Amino acid sequence: MSLWAHVYHGRFLSAEDRLQVINPCLTITGTIVHARSEADGDWHIQLDLDSEYRSLLNQANLEKQQGYLVLEPMCSNRVWQRDTIEEGVCDGFSQNTFTTDLIGHRVAATGAYVLDKQHGWTELHPVTSIVPIE
């Protein structure tokens, strides 16, 4: 089963309607500066991109994400958002690609590079891997 089956879609018809795929598989590098657990069970991670990847940011990343790219490993935490529970996207699935000890470390992250149409910023979502480098 594809990771897309576990992406929350909310008011959109499908996850692919909410997240416009720009590149289905992209690996980037940068430093994790912040992470928080979201109501839909995902991590919301802010990545300070290495200079060669800064062109991946758009105006919403600059204004709403302090100039960081968002990474969203899915179904990694307790889900308490009602529509996510009703969709059942995390039922029987847990993604363990991120731990908080990676905050402050340089990593390579791989996933689908998308435009989040709900928020307007770009992100990696779903994320397939986050590994420390150097």
Task: List the predicted regions and their residue ranges.
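OB-fold and OB-like single-stranded nucleic-acid-recognition modules
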Residues: 1-134
